[in-house]
Amino acid sequence: PYDVAAPDVNAALQETGLTMLGLNTRRGNVANGDNGLSAIPERVEEARDAIDEAVNYAAAIKAQCIHVMAGFASGPEAHKTFTANLKYACDAALIHGIKILIEPLNHYDAPGYFLTTTEQAGNLIKEVKAVNLALMFDCYHVQLMEGDLSHRLAELMPVIGHIQFASVPDRGTPDHGEINFEHIFSIISELGYSAPVGAEYKPVGPTIDTLGWMSKYI
């Protein structure tokens, strides 16, 4: 949202009665292929500038969460860098009551991305030991990388900070594809998750025309 001034976002939120759930750190130079910065050893200064910007912006619009994007990297130095940057982000966000999220991305859509599995994310959360660090569980990515969504949700619920969904394999509306979302939403409710869930799919046409799937849930 960084191209829009925070006061303008606040005005839109007040007008619609909505709250801002979260935002991402800047991805970097997208034209050069960046998809996050925080696990790239030689770009720590840029990563922390992006974290500072995200924290300040999130605080200004009262956003609840920030997704710190790792970027394309691998190996022990990348792990060390990402861990240090997550600690930095958690410390900066904590004073504003903001939660930091990490999200595994599938290696079909984002080959070379540092964070790809829920196991890796869970281990990072244990290592960082920050009260405001949590997992963004995207059903689309987890299904493509691991499957077994019901058990993954049950196992990881204590560290889940946000849930997103889209159909697999086309990342469309959740009324088709290989995931039974009626079952998944029931599991999420049974596990005691009461926060909002995010429909992060690719609409075919105007988004407003693709919301028919919601009728059975509202």
Can you annotate each of these PLM segments?
Residues 53, 62-63, 87-88, 99, ...:
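Histidine-acidic metal/acid-base catalytic patches
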Residues 3-21, 52-59, 83-94, 148-155:
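Short amphipathic alpha-helices and their capping/turn segments at secondary-structure boundaries
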Residues 1, 22-24, 67, 101, ...:
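Conserved beta-strand positions in the central sheet of alpha/beta enzyme cores
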Residues 2-5, 26-29, 70-74, 104-108, ...:
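Active-site-proximal loop/turn and secondary-structure-junction residues that shape catalytic pockets
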